[in-house]
Amino acid sequence: MKYGSYIIEKREYVYIKRLLNISGYDHTLAHKLALEKLKHKIEDAIIVEENEMPLEIIRINSSVKIKCLRNSSVMPLQIVIPMDEDLKKQKFSILSPLPVSLIGYSKGDIVNLTFSKDKEEQYIIEEVKQDTTANIPI
């Protein structure tokens, strides 16, 4: 982990805390586990102001490319607010398991991701781009 800890921008921290307060009623186990992981992640994160936020940190509205270290397959995705989720366009809600696993990491970090039962793979974060035109409804 490049920065030694997860880094989250202050407004996004507030937004995620609000989402967690109203999102505890999801019925799938995977989402319940993701929400719990997100809760712990933001509790352990370094919270910074917008002007202190490194551009290479994965956050809400980031477009990301991750590459599997085993077979070099590349997966592009964007992390969005729940109402903007569109899986056909590779836009994943911040409350989904994959974005929860990636949020707070930076370009060059290696993360362990599980896409199927008990099959964990290592991925490197190859690219992080910020969409500065999208606003978070706080």
Give the positions of each predicted feature.
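N-terminal intrinsically disordered, low-complexity, charge/repeat-rich segments that act as generic
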Residues: M1-P54
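Long amphipathic N-terminal alpha/beta scaffold segment
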Residues: K37-E85
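Conserved NTP-handling cores and scaffolds of large molecular machines
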Residues: I42-I46, S106, T132
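Non-DNA-binding regulatory cores of transcription-related proteins
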Residues: V74-K119
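Short, solvent-exposed secondary-structure boundary/capping segments
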Residues: K88-K91, T133-I138
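Conserved hydrophobic positions within beta-strands
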Residues: I125-V128
